């Protein structure tokens, strides 16, 4: 039986020091601001040099996690090891690559008293980068014409059809703006080698870019939303 505690204890990941793409620092600050000393925050990191975790008074402890590539079992074992010493009430995974892992582990975590609030695998499959354009079309959301090219030997053909400049995107993460067929082939080969599954091609569209962070309830209604306009764009978009 879990011992009753006065404080709640939440594990938070994503502490590279940059809010995008690792917003753990911002999440921890929000929790600390709202709950003060009534919360213990356990930081989860894949790198001991994660600078976002070190500001004084932000988190209570920092734990090194095994790489996600080690598999679900390694992640679960490490969480349960931490949980055995200091029982965790909830986990907030702040990296997009972690969401699927913790979604798959949610039932096992629940059995050990650890709560999550994550989409199920079916919903995650629905909005993967390969499937996202179809989701947008179905829900009348404007989106660039997107071509998934599973065989990168066909990249040159489809890139020429779209025209230049265009965006070459990995199936999981990462992207590159290219200005020629040669650049498209090179970047497609690089991204496919890194992420697998081919690449996505999109026309490059000028304009302001935004990141929107949303917290939803179980019924998908929005609890809170914060849009951020990107003030600077690097070569990866």
Listing of model-derived features with the role each one plays in the protein:
Residues 1-117:
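ATP-binding N-terminal substructure of ATP-dependent carboxylate-amine bond-forming enzymes
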Residues 117-123:
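Hinge/lid segment of periplasmic solute-binding proteins
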Residues 224-226, 235-237:
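Oxyanion-binding "anion nests"
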């Amino acid at each position: 039986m879990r011992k009753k505690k006065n404080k709640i204890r939440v594990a938070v990941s994503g502490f590279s020091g940059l809010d995008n793409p690792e917003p753990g620092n911002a999440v921890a600050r929000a929790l600390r601001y709202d709950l003060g000393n009534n919360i213990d925050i356990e930081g989860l990191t894949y790198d001991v040099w994660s600078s976002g975790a070190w500001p004084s008074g932000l988190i209570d402890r920092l734990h090194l996690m095994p790489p996600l590539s080690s598999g679900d079992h390694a992640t679960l074992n490490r969480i349960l090891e931490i949980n055995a010493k200091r029982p965790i009430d909830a986990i907030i995974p702040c990296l997009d690559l972690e969401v699927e892992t913790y979604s798959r582990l949610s039932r096992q975590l629940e059995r050990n008293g650890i709560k999550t609030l994550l989409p199920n695998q079916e919903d995650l499959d629905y909005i993967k980068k390969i499937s996202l354009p179809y989701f947008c079309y179905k829900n009348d959301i404007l989106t660039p014409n997107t071509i998934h090219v599973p065989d990168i030997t066909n990249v040159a053909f489809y890139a020429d059809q779209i025209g230049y400049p265009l965006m070459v995107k990995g199936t999981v993460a990462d992207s590159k703006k290219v200005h020629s067929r040669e650049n498209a082939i090179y970047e497609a080969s690089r991204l496919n080698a890194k992420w697998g599954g081919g690449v996505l091609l999109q026309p490059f569209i000028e304009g302001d870019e935004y990141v929107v962070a949303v917290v939803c309830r179980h019924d998908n209604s929005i609890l809170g939303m914060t849009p951020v306009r990107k003030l600077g764009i690097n070569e990866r978009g």
